[in-house]
Amino acid sequence: MSFTGTQQKCKACEKTVYAVELLSADGVGYHKSCFKCTHCKSRLQLSSYSSMEGVLYCKPHFEQLFKESGSFNKNFQSPAKSADKSTPELTRTPSRVAGRFSGTQEKCATCSKTVYPIEKVTVESQTYHKSCFKCSHGGCPISPSNYAALEGILYCKHHFAQLFKEKGSYNHLIKSASIKRSAAAAVAAGVPAASVPES
């Protein structure tokens, strides 16, 4: 008696995939060992992969693809392969017009770094990274539909109410918000936080 296996082929290597090694993603079968990022070749997990038109990527490279091209068009920018290159690619300064094509110019209200569309949260005409959009008191995750803001500082509703109950007013929060804004501005300007005077 012989076991013939399945007729399903791995999309990556086109060889037969047996049930014990079958991984099915987006309705397509792969060997576990063939389920890799197209760009870096690292092994992927079903819980942490992205695909575009059947091409597999790890989450960081999928996001990088979007950031570099401004769209999900499956093409990473590849460096020119010229033999007479005298300076490494990473040390070159961008041209004057490069800023016009580098995506968004929006800055995060919390960290002052560029916010790309894939990681953007906008509330009250302020833009944040998803990772920066959290309660300033406890670091709790918040959402655009479940937060409170005072003087531009974000809070979860629980901590906002708790801080009000502690003092009976929001005056101490306004002072704290002013200090946090001053410290953030100093960090963005390159001044050490210890030298920022408290008001």
From Swiss-Prot:
SUPFAM superfamilies: Glucocorticoid receptor-like (DNA-binding domain)
Compartments (UniProt record): Cytoplasm, Cytoskeleton
Signal peptide: none
InterPro entries: Znf_LIM (IPR001781)
Domain (LIM zinc-binding): residue spans on this chain: 8-68, 106-166
Record SMART domains: LIM
UniProt GO molecular function: actin filament binding; metal ion binding; mRNA binding
Additional note from the record: Cross-links actin with a constant of dissociation of 0.5 uM.
Assembly with partners or alone: Interacts with F-actin.
General function of this protein: Binds to actin filaments and promotes cross-linking into thick bundles. Has an actin-stabilizing activity. The actin regulatory activities are not regulated by pH and [Ca(2+)].
Protein name according to UniProt: LIM domain-containing protein WLIM2b
Organism: Arabidopsis thaliana
